[in-house]
Amino acid sequence: EHLPKRWSELTGIAETEARATLKAEYAVLHGKIEWYCLDYWTRRLNLPITALKREISDKIAMREDTPAFLQALQQSGRRIVLVTNAHPDSLSLKIELTPLATYIDELISTHEFGVTKEQQELWQQLQARLGFDAKRTLFVDDSLPILHAAQQFGIGHLLAVANPDSQQPVRQIDEFPAIIDYRDLVADILAAPVIAN
């Protein structure tokens, strides 16, 4: 909602036209790196997209159930890697405004690879870089197409987030195990620590 409004204010285009144009472009680009790319949208709209994101930075926060989940993963000896389709500037803003980085061993923007989590090429490049055992890896995401891509690659443990947006109702997810509150997993994680070889 913020982008069409600001695009209208800064350029004089009607807000309804801005909204319709963006909706059409989002549909074409969904799942592609451009959809997530602040540089692309800055060029396309001739707007300072990173600055506009800062205008709504009060909306950037960690879910309240996330710290306990990530702490349990840390305490259990598991390596925690965050892989996001977000542009590096979006990721930097989140790191600046939340304690997320204190819980994560490695933060990766798919922009480093030029492909998104929806694409098999990304999973191949991640495995080459990180050397993970796909069958023993847990991957958590709120996007069903991304979870399907991870499944196709052979990720052994997949978990869907049924309520990624607190302003929206909980989604019914049948294709994958789903979680509403990460804290529900803490006891099981701590009960099964990783044994170092």
Segments (PLM) and residue ranges:
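Small-residue helix-packing motif on alpha-helices
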Residues: 18-19, 52, 137
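Short linear capping/connector segments at secondary-structure termini
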Residues: 20-26, 54-58, 107-109
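Asp-based, Mg2+/Mn2+-dependent phosphohydrolase catalytic module
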Residues: 71, 87-88, 92-197
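Active-site neighborhood of HAD-like aspartate-dependent phosphohydrolases
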Residues: 1-20, 152
